[in-house]
A protein has these predicted regions:
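Short strand-connecting beta-turns/loops that link adjacent beta-strands
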Residues: 1, 157-159
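Non-cysteine beta-strand/loop elements that form the S-adenosyl-L-methionine
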Residues: 1-6, 60-64
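Histidine/acidic-residue-rich, glycine-tolerant segments that coordinate divalent metal ions
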Residues: 2-20, 71, 167
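Catalytic metal-binding/acid-base residues of hydrolase active sites
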Residues: 5, 40, 67-68
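His/Asp/Glu-enriched, well-ordered alpha-helical/loop segment
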Residues: 18-36, 47, 52-147, 151-154
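Glycine-rich anion/phosphate-binding loop at the beta-strand->alpha-helix junction
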Residues: 39-45
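Short, compositionally biased
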Residues: 162-171
Length: 174
């Protein structure tokens, strides 16, 4: 389930009966994975922790859903009907979120510091789990002999300090 919790109905009432929504159905399907925009805006930190507790590290992947304006600050017009405001793209009429500008390091910091998910699990949800979902774990998602050398490093405050992609240092990513 991609964009988990975004534009997904939760339990609702149909006549006198309660009917499970998409969210409850996804939780009930134990084998289903979820992809969550863990920026703390699309899904609040407390809900990120709930998803982690229910689905676990093997079934929860972090995704950015970043638009072309990822990492931008301030208020800009993204498209005629979308504005960047308060760190997120919104519909111009403010009726809904329209996309994320968060980068993966932001999702990692939010998951560790605000959602209080263990660091080792957060890194797995940002690398191993997505690689398994996409069917590329034979070459991505972990540091092992024979796999692509895609490596990132953080400082003690979880700020990105080093990027290596396919064995090559990337200096324009920081």
């Amino acid at each position: 389930a991609t964009h988990f919790y975004n534009a997904m109905p939760v339990v609702y009432k149909e006549h006198e009966f309660k009917v499970p929504g998409t969210v409850e159905s996804v939780y009930a399907l134990q084998d289903m994975t979820v992809e969550t925009i863990a920026d703390g805006i699309h899904v609040p930190p407390v809900m990120l922790h709930v998803v982690y507790q229910i689905k676990g590290v093997e079934k929860m992947a972090l995704i950015t859903d970043s638009l072309a304006y990822a990492a931008c600050n301030g208020e800009v017009t993204c498209e005629p009907r979308v504005i960047l405001e308060d760190g997120v793209c919104k519909l111009a009429d403010h009726s809904a979120l329209a996309g994320s500008i968060a980068t993966m390091d932001t999702l990692i910091r939010t998951s560790i510091l605000k959602a209080e998910i263990p660091m080792i699990d957060v890194f797995r949800m940002a690398s191993e789990t997505p690689a398994k979902i996409m069917g590329v774990f034979d070459r991505k998602g972990s540091i092992e002999e024979g796999k692509d050398a895609d490596i990132i490093m953080f400082d003690k405050d979880i700020n990105l300090t080093y990027v290596m992609q396919m064995g090559h240092e990337k200096t324009n990513c920081l």
